[in-house]
Protein backbone atom coordinates (compact mmCIF):
# COMPACT_ATOMS: atom_id res chain seq x y z
CA UNK A 1 0.00 0.00 0.00
CA UNK A 2 1.01 3.61 -0.49
CA UNK A 3 0.31 6.55 1.81
CA UNK A 4 -1.00 8.85 -0.91
CA UNK A 5 -2.57 8.77 -4.33
CA UNK A 6 -4.20 11.32 -6.60
CA UNK A 7 -7.84 11.38 -7.64
CA UNK A 8 -7.66 13.81 -10.51
CA UNK A 9 -5.66 16.78 -9.25
CA UNK A 10 -6.39 16.16 -5.56
CA UNK A 11 -3.92 14.33 -3.38
CA UNK A 12 -5.52 11.88 -0.97
CA UNK A 13 -4.07 10.27 2.13
CA UNK A 14 -1.40 11.13 4.67
CA UNK A 15 -1.11 14.82 5.56
CA UNK A 16 -3.93 15.69 3.14
CA UNK A 17 -7.35 17.20 3.78
CA UNK A 18 -10.20 14.73 4.07
CA UNK A 19 -11.63 13.74 0.69
CA UNK A 20 -15.44 13.92 0.68
CA UNK A 21 -17.55 11.82 -1.69
CA UNK A 22 -21.21 12.75 -2.14
CA UNK A 23 -22.88 9.45 -2.99
CA UNK A 24 -25.84 10.40 -5.16
CA UNK A 25 -26.50 6.71 -5.84
CA UNK A 26 -30.24 6.27 -6.49
CA UNK A 27 -31.24 9.75 -5.31
CA UNK A 28 -31.59 10.95 -8.90
CA UNK A 29 -34.89 8.99 -8.89
CA UNK A 30 -34.45 8.12 -12.55
CA UNK A 31 -34.35 11.76 -13.62
CA UNK A 32 -31.28 13.06 -15.45
CA UNK A 33 -32.03 16.70 -14.68
CA UNK A 34 -32.22 15.86 -10.99
CA UNK A 35 -28.91 13.99 -11.23
CA UNK A 36 -27.26 17.02 -12.83
CA UNK A 37 -28.72 19.33 -10.19
CA UNK A 38 -27.43 17.06 -7.42
CA UNK A 39 -23.93 17.29 -8.89
CA UNK A 40 -24.13 21.08 -8.82
CA UNK A 41 -25.47 21.13 -5.26
CA UNK A 42 -22.83 18.66 -4.05
CA UNK A 43 -20.08 20.82 -5.51
CA UNK A 44 -21.49 23.96 -3.90
CA UNK A 45 -21.77 22.14 -0.57
CA UNK A 46 -18.05 21.32 -0.64
CA UNK A 47 -17.88 17.73 -1.88
CA UNK A 48 -14.75 16.63 -3.73
CA UNK A 49 -16.55 13.99 -5.78
CA UNK A 50 -20.07 13.08 -6.86
CA UNK A 51 -20.57 9.33 -7.04
CA UNK A 52 -23.12 7.29 -8.94
CA UNK A 53 -23.77 3.57 -9.42
CA UNK A 54 -23.64 1.82 -12.79
CA UNK A 55 -25.75 -1.31 -12.95
CA UNK A 56 -28.77 -2.83 -14.59
CA UNK A 57 -31.21 -4.76 -12.45
CA UNK A 58 -30.39 -7.93 -14.37
CA UNK A 59 -26.66 -7.70 -13.59
CA UNK A 60 -26.94 -7.00 -9.87
CA UNK A 61 -29.95 -8.89 -8.47
CA UNK A 62 -31.86 -12.08 -9.13
CA UNK A 63 -35.59 -11.39 -9.20
CA UNK A 64 -36.25 -15.06 -8.51
CA UNK A 65 -33.65 -15.15 -5.76
CA UNK A 66 -35.13 -12.26 -3.79
CA UNK A 67 -38.70 -13.46 -4.23
CA UNK A 68 -37.70 -16.90 -2.99
CA UNK A 69 -36.55 -15.33 0.30
CA UNK A 70 -40.20 -14.67 1.09
CA UNK A 71 -40.53 -11.35 2.88
CA UNK A 72 -38.18 -8.50 1.99
CA UNK A 73 -35.63 -7.92 4.75
CA UNK A 74 -34.10 -4.99 6.65
CA UNK A 75 -34.54 -1.63 4.88
CA UNK A 76 -36.05 -3.42 1.87
CA UNK A 77 -39.05 -4.42 4.00
CA UNK A 78 -40.45 -0.89 3.58
CA UNK A 79 -40.19 -0.93 -0.20
CA UNK A 80 -43.55 -1.04 -1.96
CA UNK A 81 -41.97 -2.53 -5.08
CA UNK A 82 -39.97 -5.71 -5.48
CA UNK A 83 -36.20 -5.54 -5.09
CA UNK A 84 -35.80 -6.11 -8.82
CA UNK A 85 -38.18 -3.25 -9.67
CA UNK A 86 -36.44 -0.84 -7.27
CA UNK A 87 -33.06 -1.60 -8.81
CA UNK A 88 -34.52 -1.24 -12.27
CA UNK A 89 -35.86 2.22 -11.37
CA UNK A 90 -32.54 3.24 -9.79
CA UNK A 91 -30.33 2.16 -12.68
CA UNK A 92 -28.54 4.75 -14.80
CA UNK A 93 -28.94 4.65 -18.58
CA UNK A 94 -25.49 4.34 -20.10
CA UNK A 95 -26.00 7.44 -22.22
CA UNK A 96 -26.18 9.50 -19.02
CA UNK A 97 -22.53 8.78 -18.29
CA UNK A 98 -20.92 11.38 -20.52
CA UNK A 99 -23.47 13.98 -19.39
CA UNK A 100 -22.76 13.27 -15.72
CA UNK A 101 -19.03 13.43 -16.34
CA UNK A 102 -19.36 16.73 -18.18
CA UNK A 103 -21.50 18.27 -15.44
CA UNK A 104 -18.93 17.22 -12.84
CA UNK A 105 -16.17 18.81 -14.90
CA UNK A 106 -18.24 21.98 -15.28
CA UNK A 107 -18.66 22.21 -11.50
CA UNK A 108 -15.04 21.31 -10.67
CA UNK A 109 -16.00 18.12 -8.87
CA UNK A 110 -14.73 14.60 -9.59
CA UNK A 111 -17.04 12.07 -11.26
CA UNK A 112 -16.99 8.67 -9.56
CA UNK A 113 -19.12 5.59 -9.88
CA UNK A 114 -19.39 2.01 -8.67
CA UNK A 115 -19.68 -0.36 -11.65
CA UNK A 116 -21.51 -3.58 -10.81
CA UNK A 117 -20.40 -5.85 -13.64
CA UNK A 118 -17.15 -6.68 -15.40
CA UNK A 119 -18.48 -5.16 -18.62
CA UNK A 120 -19.47 -1.95 -16.85
CA UNK A 121 -16.00 -1.64 -15.33
CA UNK A 122 -14.63 -1.44 -18.85
CA UNK A 123 -17.40 0.91 -19.97
CA UNK A 124 -16.90 3.51 -17.21
CA UNK A 125 -13.10 3.26 -17.10
CA UNK A 126 -12.49 6.09 -19.64
CA UNK A 127 -14.63 8.43 -17.55
CA UNK A 128 -12.98 7.78 -14.19
CA UNK A 129 -9.92 8.86 -12.23
CA UNK A 130 -10.77 6.35 -9.47
CA UNK A 131 -13.17 3.49 -8.80
CA UNK A 132 -15.46 2.80 -5.85
CA UNK A 133 -16.34 -0.79 -4.96
CA UNK A 134 -19.45 -1.33 -2.87
CA UNK A 135 -19.47 -3.49 0.26
CA UNK A 136 -21.56 -6.19 -1.38
CA UNK A 137 -18.78 -7.01 -3.84
CA UNK A 138 -16.01 -7.54 -1.28
CA UNK A 139 -16.18 -11.31 -1.86
CA UNK A 140 -16.44 -11.05 -5.66
CA UNK A 141 -12.69 -11.15 -6.13
CA UNK A 142 -13.00 -11.39 -9.90
CA UNK A 143 -14.40 -7.86 -10.27
CA UNK A 144 -12.07 -6.41 -7.62
CA UNK A 145 -9.06 -7.84 -9.44
CA UNK A 146 -10.36 -6.43 -12.73
CA UNK A 147 -10.80 -2.97 -11.24
CA UNK A 148 -7.39 -3.11 -9.58
CA UNK A 149 -5.83 -4.05 -12.92
CA UNK A 150 -6.90 -0.68 -14.36
CA UNK A 151 -4.08 0.91 -12.36
CA UNK A 152 -6.24 3.68 -10.93
CA UNK A 153 -6.97 4.39 -7.25
CA UNK A 154 -9.85 2.31 -5.95
CA UNK A 155 -11.89 2.54 -2.78
CA UNK A 156 -13.42 -0.53 -1.18
CA UNK A 157 -16.21 -0.39 1.41
CA UNK A 158 -16.30 -3.18 3.99
CA UNK A 159 -19.87 -3.23 5.30
CA UNK A 160 -21.33 -6.56 6.45
CA UNK A 161 -17.90 -8.21 6.32
CA UNK A 162 -15.55 -9.79 8.82
CA UNK A 163 -11.82 -9.64 9.46
CA UNK A 164 -11.05 -12.48 7.07
CA UNK A 165 -13.03 -10.84 4.27
CA UNK A 166 -11.08 -7.60 4.70
CA UNK A 167 -7.70 -9.30 4.99
CA UNK A 168 -8.39 -11.38 1.89
CA UNK A 169 -9.34 -8.40 -0.25
CA UNK A 170 -6.42 -6.25 0.91
CA UNK A 171 -3.89 -9.02 0.31
CA UNK A 172 -5.41 -9.94 -3.04
CA UNK A 173 -5.93 -6.48 -4.50
CA UNK A 174 -2.83 -4.70 -3.18
CA UNK A 175 -0.59 -7.17 -5.03
CA UNK A 176 -2.13 -5.93 -8.28
CA UNK A 177 -2.47 -2.23 -7.46
CA UNK A 178 -1.36 -0.59 -4.22
CA UNK A 179 -3.42 2.59 -4.73
CA UNK A 180 -6.11 1.33 -2.41
CA UNK A 181 -8.39 2.83 0.25
CA UNK A 182 -10.35 0.66 2.67
CA UNK A 183 -13.51 2.13 4.19
CA UNK A 184 -15.05 1.02 7.44
CA UNK A 185 -18.77 0.74 6.80
CA UNK A 186 -21.97 -0.51 8.38
CA UNK A 187 -24.48 -1.44 5.72
CA UNK A 188 -27.74 -0.93 7.52
CA UNK A 189 -29.87 1.55 5.59
CA UNK A 190 -32.82 1.91 7.97
CA UNK A 191 -31.82 5.44 9.14
CA UNK A 192 -32.30 4.28 12.74
CA UNK A 193 -30.37 6.08 15.49
CA UNK A 194 -29.75 2.63 16.91
CA UNK A 195 -27.23 2.10 14.10
CA UNK A 196 -24.58 4.24 15.81
CA UNK A 197 -23.72 1.44 18.22
CA UNK A 198 -22.85 -0.81 15.28
CA UNK A 199 -20.46 1.56 13.47
CA UNK A 200 -17.34 0.19 15.20
CA UNK A 201 -15.18 3.17 14.28
CA UNK A 202 -12.36 1.72 16.37
CA UNK A 203 -11.83 -0.80 13.58
CA UNK A 204 -10.01 2.06 11.84
CA UNK A 205 -7.49 2.04 14.69
CA UNK A 206 -7.04 -1.70 14.22
CA UNK A 207 -6.47 -1.30 10.47
CA UNK A 208 -4.02 1.54 11.05
CA UNK A 209 -1.90 -0.66 13.31
CA UNK A 210 -2.08 -3.67 11.01
CA UNK A 211 -1.51 -1.77 7.75
CA UNK A 212 0.34 1.46 8.69
CA UNK A 213 0.47 2.83 5.13
CA UNK A 214 -3.10 1.96 4.18
CA UNK A 215 -5.38 4.89 3.33
CA UNK A 216 -8.50 4.60 5.48
CA UNK A 217 -12.02 5.87 5.02
CA UNK A 218 -15.60 5.73 6.23
CA UNK A 219 -18.72 5.01 4.22
CA UNK A 220 -21.51 6.13 6.51
CA UNK A 221 -25.30 5.89 6.56
CA UNK A 222 -26.11 7.54 9.90
CA UNK A 223 -27.53 10.98 10.55
CA UNK A 224 -25.48 13.95 11.70
CA UNK A 225 -21.76 14.51 11.89
CA UNK A 226 -20.55 12.56 14.93
CA UNK A 227 -19.56 9.40 13.05
CA UNK A 228 -17.66 11.40 10.43
CA UNK A 229 -15.81 13.46 13.03
CA UNK A 230 -14.98 10.33 14.99
CA UNK A 231 -13.63 8.60 11.88
CA UNK A 232 -11.47 11.57 10.91
CA UNK A 233 -10.01 11.72 14.41
CA UNK A 234 -9.13 8.02 14.08
CA UNK A 235 -7.34 8.47 10.77
CA UNK A 236 -9.98 8.31 8.02
CA UNK A 237 -8.91 10.36 4.99
CA UNK A 238 -11.89 9.60 2.72
CA UNK A 239 -15.52 10.09 3.74
CA UNK A 240 -18.51 8.92 1.74
CA UNK A 241 -22.09 9.81 2.62
CA UNK A 242 -25.27 9.76 0.56
CA UNK A 243 -26.48 13.09 -0.80
CA UNK A 244 -30.01 14.28 -1.51
CA UNK A 245 -31.97 17.49 -1.93
CA UNK A 246 -34.43 16.47 0.81
CA UNK A 247 -34.88 13.68 3.33
CA UNK A 248 -38.63 13.87 2.73
CA UNK A 249 -38.43 12.49 -0.81
CA UNK A 250 -39.55 8.95 -1.56
CA UNK A 251 -36.85 6.51 -2.55
CA UNK A 252 -34.53 3.89 -1.05
CA UNK A 253 -31.72 6.26 -0.01
CA UNK A 254 -33.24 9.67 0.74
CA UNK A 255 -34.01 9.11 4.44
CA UNK A 256 -30.42 8.57 5.58
CA UNK A 257 -28.78 10.99 3.13
CA UNK A 258 -27.21 14.38 3.79
CA UNK A 259 -28.86 17.51 2.42
CA UNK A 260 -26.86 20.44 0.99
CA UNK A 261 -27.26 22.30 4.30
CA UNK A 262 -26.14 19.40 6.49
CA UNK A 263 -23.30 18.60 4.07
CA UNK A 264 -21.92 22.13 4.36
CA UNK A 265 -22.10 21.86 8.14
CA UNK A 266 -20.25 18.54 8.01
CA UNK A 267 -17.47 20.07 5.93
CA UNK A 268 -17.15 23.03 8.29
CA UNK A 269 -17.04 20.85 11.41
CA UNK A 270 -14.56 18.49 9.74
CA UNK A 271 -12.22 21.34 8.81
CA UNK A 272 -12.35 22.57 12.40
CA UNK A 273 -11.49 19.07 13.59
CA UNK A 274 -8.64 18.65 11.11
CA UNK A 275 -7.20 21.97 12.20
CA UNK A 276 -7.41 20.94 15.84
CA UNK A 277 -5.74 17.51 15.52
CA UNK A 278 -2.19 18.88 15.27
CA UNK A 279 1.02 16.90 14.85
CA UNK A 280 0.98 15.01 18.15
CA UNK A 281 4.01 16.85 19.55
CA UNK A 282 3.38 18.58 22.88
CA UNK A 283 4.77 22.10 22.79
CA UNK A 284 3.90 25.66 23.68
CA UNK A 285 1.86 26.78 20.71
CA UNK A 286 2.33 30.15 19.03
CA UNK A 287 -0.97 31.44 20.37
CA UNK A 288 -0.01 30.49 23.95
CA UNK A 289 3.26 32.41 24.25
CA UNK A 290 1.68 35.36 26.03
CA UNK A 291 -0.36 33.00 28.21
CA UNK A 292 2.87 31.51 29.57
CA UNK A 293 3.75 34.94 30.93
CA UNK A 294 0.26 35.63 32.25
CA UNK A 295 -0.62 32.32 33.90
CA UNK A 296 2.62 30.75 35.02
CA UNK A 297 4.16 31.73 38.33
CA UNK A 298 7.60 33.09 39.05
CA UNK A 299 9.73 33.29 42.18
CA UNK A 300 9.51 36.72 43.84
CA UNK A 301 10.90 38.14 47.06
CA UNK A 302 8.27 39.08 49.62
CA UNK A 303 10.44 41.65 51.38
CA UNK A 304 13.30 44.01 50.66
CA UNK A 305 16.50 41.98 50.51
CA UNK A 306 20.01 43.33 50.84
CA UNK A 307 23.13 42.24 49.00
CA UNK A 308 24.86 39.13 50.46
CA UNK A 309 21.61 37.88 52.02
CA UNK A 310 21.31 34.09 52.11
CA UNK A 311 17.93 33.15 50.70
CA UNK A 312 15.46 31.28 52.87
CA UNK A 313 12.13 29.78 51.82
CA UNK A 314 10.30 32.39 53.87
CA UNK A 315 11.78 35.14 51.68
CA UNK A 316 9.97 33.89 48.61
CA UNK A 317 6.48 33.95 47.11
CA UNK A 318 5.31 32.04 44.03
CA UNK A 319 3.12 34.45 42.05
CA UNK A 320 1.96 35.36 38.57
CA UNK A 321 3.09 36.68 36.08
CA UNK A 322 6.18 34.88 34.82
CA UNK A 323 8.37 37.21 32.70
CA UNK A 324 10.81 35.57 30.30
CA UNK A 325 13.85 36.34 32.48
CA UNK A 326 12.33 34.99 35.70
CA UNK A 327 13.04 31.74 37.51
CA UNK A 328 10.16 29.29 37.44
CA UNK A 329 9.05 27.58 40.68
CA UNK A 330 10.38 24.14 39.83
CA UNK A 331 13.85 25.52 40.65
CA UNK A 332 12.99 26.82 44.11
CA UNK A 333 15.13 24.25 45.94
CA UNK A 334 18.13 25.32 43.85
CA UNK A 335 17.71 28.89 45.08
CA UNK A 336 17.34 28.33 48.81
CA UNK A 337 20.73 28.80 50.48
CA UNK A 338 22.12 30.94 47.65
CA UNK A 339 23.63 34.40 48.27
CA UNK A 340 22.08 37.51 46.72
CA UNK A 341 24.62 39.67 44.86
CA UNK A 342 22.59 42.92 44.89
CA UNK A 343 19.80 44.69 46.71
CA UNK A 344 16.32 43.54 45.61
CA UNK A 345 13.08 45.40 46.14
CA UNK A 346 9.98 43.70 47.58
CA UNK A 347 7.87 41.86 44.95
CA UNK A 348 10.69 41.82 42.37
CA UNK A 349 11.34 38.59 40.51
CA UNK A 350 14.52 36.69 41.16
CA UNK A 351 16.82 36.15 38.18
CA UNK A 352 19.71 33.72 37.91
CA UNK A 353 22.13 36.60 37.52
CA UNK A 354 21.03 37.89 40.96
CA UNK A 355 22.59 34.83 42.63
CA UNK A 356 26.16 33.88 43.47
Segments predicted by a language model, with ranges:
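Catalytic cores and adjacent flexible loops of soluble metabolic enzymes
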Residues: 1-356
Amino acid sequence: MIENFYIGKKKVGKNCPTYFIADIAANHDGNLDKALELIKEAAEAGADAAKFQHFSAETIVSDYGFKSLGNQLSHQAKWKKSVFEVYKDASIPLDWTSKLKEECKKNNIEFLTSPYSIELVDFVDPYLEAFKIGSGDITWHEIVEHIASKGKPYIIATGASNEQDVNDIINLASKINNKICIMQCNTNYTASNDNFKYLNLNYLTHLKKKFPNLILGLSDHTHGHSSVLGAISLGAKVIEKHFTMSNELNGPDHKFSMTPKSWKEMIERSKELESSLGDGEKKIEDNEIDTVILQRRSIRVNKEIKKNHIIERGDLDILRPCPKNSIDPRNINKIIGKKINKDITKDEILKWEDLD
